Amino acid sequence: MALEKGIASLVEAFIAAERPSSRVQHIDDRRAGYIASAVLAGEMETRVRVEDITLEGMNFRIVSPPTASGLLPTLIYYHGGCFVSGGFATHDNQLRQLAWFSGCRVIAVQYRLAPEHIFPAAHDDAEQGVMIIHRHAEQLGVDASRITLAGDSAGGHLALVTALRLKANTAWQPAQLILIYPMLDRTASMASYVSNGADYVITRDTLLSGYEMYLASTPANHPDASPLWRDDFHGLPPVHILTAEFDPLRDEGEALHRRLMAQGVESSCQRYLGVIHGFFQLGGISRAAREAMRDIAWRVASPGR
């Protein structure tokens, strides 16, 4: 399928600029560029309540429906950014829209970024963040039996590994996982890394340079570096995966779906056509992004439905 019109314009501009490389950007410029791109999310959702809090030394953003009270189904969200960028500012509108459309609470976890903080800092923060939320569930208005872990790109990776850590520690488990074009394979061994790796804005170079900064001396086949290849998925809650047609990560997301099912995990996977990596944050120009937003919100409202 052809690229959506708005996304095609982004791709054409990227190619016309001779495919600028994230690898040669200063990290501050890379982060600033990501924040600047948030304008493409569309009109800011204002019909929600937003609160930034610190609990047990970690920072969270809580977004709630305007009249929310009591214990609500809750989405715990990890932002993308290749482990080196992103945060509340880059994902603010997505968090707001998810809360509005789902009628649920949304809590974003701020984890430490590379290159200042290398592996396992983000993984440890992701796990610690959900444990803090779970411990304070009643205080935060969270229905602990209806928690969804979700994230995009690096955040999808963290959601998956966090659920695996919770399972290994025989701790509580979320009701479901929603993984939005997750980064899963540091070895970059899938064919879509080649077919979609150069022209579609978020390139193979973008993704691998993030891995290189965060994983540094960690082997590519470490189970937390490349969770795609793990054999301990059995016992995870239901998983829903979103992939994008023109994404270098498309094939590994779809491979994860097959591997989950082979290991007895309930899994579903939807490929969104005509879009690129990062499309979920492009609701201002992408119909697929708006459709994905509403679908995810529907799933969060009734986990396991």
Question: What annotation goes with each model-predicted range?
Answer:
Residues 89-108:
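Short amphipathic alpha-helix adjacent to the substrate-entry channel of hydrolases
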Residues 285-305:
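Catalytic active-site module of serine/aspartate enzymes centered on a nucleophile-bearing elbow/loop
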Residues 151, 155, 159:
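Gly/Ala-rich beta-loop-alpha elbow adjacent to hydrolase catalytic centers
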Residues 134-149:
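Gly/Ser-rich "nucleophile elbow"/oxyanion-hole loop immediately N-terminal to the catalytic nucleophile
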Residues 241-243:
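Short beta-strand/loop motif that positions the catalytic acidic residue
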Residues 71-81:
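Short beta-strand element of the alpha/beta-hydrolase
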Residues 1-67, 305:
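A glycine/proline-hinged amphipathic helix-loop "lid/cap" segment
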Residues 164-219:
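Hydrolase active-site cap/lid region
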